[in-house]
Amino acid sequence: MRLRVVAVGRPRLAYARLGVEEYARRMRRYAPLDLVFVRKGEELLPKAEGHRKVVLDERGRLLTTEELYRRLLVWEGERVAFLVGGAEGHPEAVREEADLLLSLSPLTLQHELALLVLMEQLYRVLTLRAGHPYHRP
């Protein structure tokens, strides 16, 4: 599985920036990862061309870690892009192109925090896939 995370804006908050960098480093041990930052939401779709598109959206489906893991197993061998909007969320065109609209929480999360939570969950899924004991159900 080849993962791409495309986010509007680089994290400016120190904790988010350091956390995203740390999880990206860890994830690359388990799967190829591209971490791409764009300036505007309209730039997300071109960066995800040729990928399955998982769009983070507060109106999306709430999945457990195990459900996300199983969904990604279905897409094994494919390229999967996770699209993280900015402070204004996603343009409608991005939501319409989603293979999966995913909500990380029923709470509204600041977009940098949402990116960090996504990175941790992707790392968790990859370790689960590899049989590593990081994830404990």
Curated annotation (Swiss-Prot):
EC number: 2.1.1.177
Gene Ontology MF term list: rRNA (pseudouridine-N3-)-methyltransferase activity
Reactions it catalyzes: pseudouridine(1915) in 23S rRNA + S-adenosyl-L-methionine = N(3)-methylpseudouridine(1915) in 23S rRNA + S-adenosyl-L-homocysteine + H(+)
Methyltransferase is among the record's keywords: yes
Keyword line: Cytoplasm, Methyltransferase, rRNA processing, S-adenosyl-L-methionine, Transferase
Compartments in which it is found: Cytoplasm
Top-level class of the enzyme under EC nomenclature: transferase
Annotated positions binding S-adenosyl-L-methionine: L56, G85, L104, S105, P106, L107, T108, L109
Superkingdom: Bacteria
GO cellular component, one term: cytoplasm
Methyltransferase among keywords: yes
Function: Specifically methylates the pseudouridine at position 1915 (m3Psi1915) in 23S rRNA.
Record family assignment: Belongs to the RNA methyltransferase RlmH family.
Assembly notes: Homodimer.
Protein name: Ribosomal RNA large subunit methyltransferase H
Organism: Thermus thermophilus (strain ATCC BAA-163 / DSM 7039 / HB27)
Phylogenetic classification of the source organism: Bacteria, Thermotogati, Deinococcota, Deinococci, Thermales
Gene designation: rlmH
